[in-house]
Regions:
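Conserved AdoMet/S-adenosylmethionine-binding subsite of the radical SAM
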Residues: 1-143, 147, 151, 155
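C-terminal accessory extensions appended to soluble enzyme cores
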Residues: 132-145, 149-205
Length: 205
């Protein structure tokens, strides 16, 4: 990874990195060198602060609170760093009492952006996830089979519901910040939901 950072620095190539690992802090000196020449930013994905939900769905990943500490440290160092609440999983980590503390913690860590991504189930992952549900959360299996019956993405209505939950969970002042204004004079984190495009029928000719 060091060689990649060095190449980005040497060519002054703007960069942004998305990761779930606080080990990104090891590369902070090189990121700061890049920031002296061009734009450099980061984003850490954090699905939840609910330890039970985290251990059930991401048992071998870094502790979410360690990721938040990395967000805070990167921002203190001058690297704009946001938080991506991902994946958002209906019935697993999307309850208000799960989302709101994470939003508050992200803001406290100085997150420059806060977004969310609904769970995607592509390829073989879909079967594996459904099997996991049947073993660990059989109460949710029928719901997920219905939500993902047409493909890898949840229906638009479900994605909009999750987007609204992220927005509602933000503190009052942030609810009134439009995305355009937030990007212009940066009064606080940008609250948004990163979404997948609706499927479009492709043409052969």
């Amino acid at each position: 990874m060091q060689g990649i950072w060095e190449a980005i620095r040497d060519f002054a190539n703007p960069c942004s990195v998305l990761t779930k690992s606080p080990l990104l802090l090891r590369d902070l000196p090189l990121m700061l060198q890049i920031a002296e020449r061009t734009s450099s930013s980061a984003c850490l994905s954090i699905p939840t602060l609910d330890e039970k939900a985290w251990r059930a769905t991401e048992p071998h990943t870094p502790n979410p609170r360690a990721r938040l500490e990395a967000v805070a440290e990167l921002n203190r160092a001058g690297i704009p760093t946001g938080v991506l609440i991902a994946p958002l999983m209906p019935g697993i980590n999307d309850a208000p009492h799960q989302v709101e503390p994470l939003l508050e913690a992200a803001i406290a860590a100085g997150a420059t952006s806060i977004g969310g991504i609904a769970l995607h189930l592509r390829g073989e992952v879909k079967g594996l996830f459904m099997q996991w549900l049947s073993e660990q959360r059989p109460d949710l299996l029928a719901r997920y089979e219905q939500l993902y019956r047409r493909g890898a993405y949840a229906p638009v209505a479900e994605r909009k519901r999750l987007a609204a939950m992220v927005r509602r969970g933000a503190p009052g002042p942030l609810r009134r910040i439009s995305l355009s204004r937030a990007r212009e004079d940066h009064p606080g984190p940008v609250i948004e939901l990163c979404d997948a495009p609706d499927p479009v029928q492709q043409r052969l000719f």
